[in-house]
């Protein structure tokens, strides 16, 4: 792997569970899915550990360097105007002050995919 390709500023919307489930549906590769389960769980938990400012189970986008532009990148919608009025909340692992509906919808759906993966693979 090329370490210059790593982006430590932010992550992207949580779609890994969906992707793994789609791979499983096509390949029936249970070994691959079983290998991915702990990684999927760790990634899902990461959101609540590092991107839930007030611990109310609703996450916010953010960045590791404290920049608003990197927090916007985390959404996958880099220049979306909906983030223009947002602020970085200091002391919060640099999350923005908005609980985005899309992010929390992705996380809810990820829970469903984790359930499917853990129970059917």
Task: Label each PLM-derived region with a short phrase.
Residues 2-25, 30-34, 38, 45-121:
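The feature captures the catalytic groove of carbohydrate-active enzymes
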